[in-house]
């Protein structure tokens, strides 16, 4: 079968002819229709330090997808041939304390599709049926293919009550932009997003941000004054992994504010803990999606009128994958879709 593989320990992704994956008794075989390129895939392409320490080579990559069930393991119940599915990319162990308590998103033995095991950038993918999520008929293939990153946005944004709150989002990548749309949809008052990438700030404004702030040109505190904010942000969503952005967030949070952190700093990050202590801030780390509460919320948000389609800015045939990766690496894109049909 046709697949995109991290074939060599150097920059790049390669098209290969890979064997069709074999199923187990509890698995589904999925024929891939569309995949989306994640920031993680860009890290793997670039072969940065994280990738060198994490990714086995060679390996089929990719974990954002939608496809059709074409074969079902003999122990699987609840799925039929032809079902349209996406899937949770974190394969959990099922036997650790958190898994047994129903907190599978906190499994300490997680394996990642397209990170630790063969991924979805292929004509066929095998995953445990437990990880598959049926896509409602009224949700398009395009939107279903980005449910994985949309889930990161939903999990982060809905960590705290947002109704009537002022929200600061640091980092206008696709996940941060989708989080801004979620915040507005569920009733936040002001949603301010910061970055230095004008293309993505414009996209964030289109998707519902009250203000998209280029912090290289504007002072965040001036924007707060312009919006009539006198006390600070109630909720912070840190999506960038940039220390200066997190420091700015701590400076502008209201007392008793709540911060959800999805962005991963590149190394150790020093912060002024006195601000956390004296402001009484709550900081919560976010990893992946809650299984499967986040997935049900994703579908329901779209079905209730949330439009995240503007975040999809580029489509390519899979044979044009290099153009897709070039678009993602340029920073002048939202989500990039590869068509496998």
Curated annotation (Swiss-Prot):
GO terms for biological process: L-threonine catabolic process to glycine. It is found in: Cytoplasm. Binds 2 Zn(2+) ions per subunit. Zn(2+) 1 binds at residues 38, 63-64. Keywords: Cytoplasm, Metal-binding, NAD, Oxidoreductase, Zinc. InterPro entries: ADH-like_C, ADH-like_N, ADH_Zn_CS, GroES-like_sf, L-Threonine_3-DHase, NAD(P)-bd_dom_sf, PKS_ER, Zn_alcohol_dh. This is L-threonine 3-dehydrogenase. GO terms for cellular component: cytoplasm.
């Amino acid at each position: 079968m046709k697949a995109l593989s991290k074939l060599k320990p150097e920059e790049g992704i390669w098209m290969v002819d890979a064997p069709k994956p074999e199923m187990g008794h509890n698995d589904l075989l999925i024929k891939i229709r569309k995949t989306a390129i994640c920031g993680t895939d860009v890290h793997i392409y670039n072969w940065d330090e994280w990738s060198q320490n994490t990714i086995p080579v060679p390996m089929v990559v990719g974990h954002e997808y939608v496809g059709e069930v074409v074969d079902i393991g003999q122990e699987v119940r609840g799925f039929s041939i032809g079902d349209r599915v996406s899937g949770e990319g974190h394969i959990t162990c099922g036997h650790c304390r958190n898994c047994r308590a129903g907190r599978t998103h906190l499994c300490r033995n997680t394996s990642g599709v397209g990170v630790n095991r063969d991924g979805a950038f292929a004509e066929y993918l095998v995953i445990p049926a437990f990880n598959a999520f049926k896509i409602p008929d009224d949700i398009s293939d395009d939107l279903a293919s980005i449910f994985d990153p949309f889930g990161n946005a939903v999990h982060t944004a809905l960590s705290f009550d947002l109704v009537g709150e002022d929200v600061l989002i640091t980092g206008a990548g696709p996940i941060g932009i989708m989080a801004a749309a979620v915040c507005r949809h569920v009733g936040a008052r002001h949603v301010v997003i910061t970055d230095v990438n004008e293309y993505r700030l414009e996209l964030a404004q289109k998707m519902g941000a009250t203000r998209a702030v280029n912090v290289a040109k504007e002072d965040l505190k001036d924007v707060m004054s312009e919006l009539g904010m006198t006390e600070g942000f109630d909720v912070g969503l840190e999506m960038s992994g940039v220390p200066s952005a997190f420091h700015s967030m701590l400076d502008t949070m209201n007392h008793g504010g709540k911060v959800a952190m999805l962005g991963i700093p590149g190394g150790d990050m020093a912060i002024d803990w006195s601000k956390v202590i004296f402001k009484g801030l709550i900081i919560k780390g976010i990893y992946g999606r809650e299984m499967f509460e986040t997935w049900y919320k994703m579908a329901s948000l779209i079905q209730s009128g949330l439009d995240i389609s503007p975040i999809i800015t580029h489509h390519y045939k899979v044979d044009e994958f290099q153009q897709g990766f070039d678009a993602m690496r340029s920073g002048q894109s939202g989500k990039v879709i590869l068509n496998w049909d």
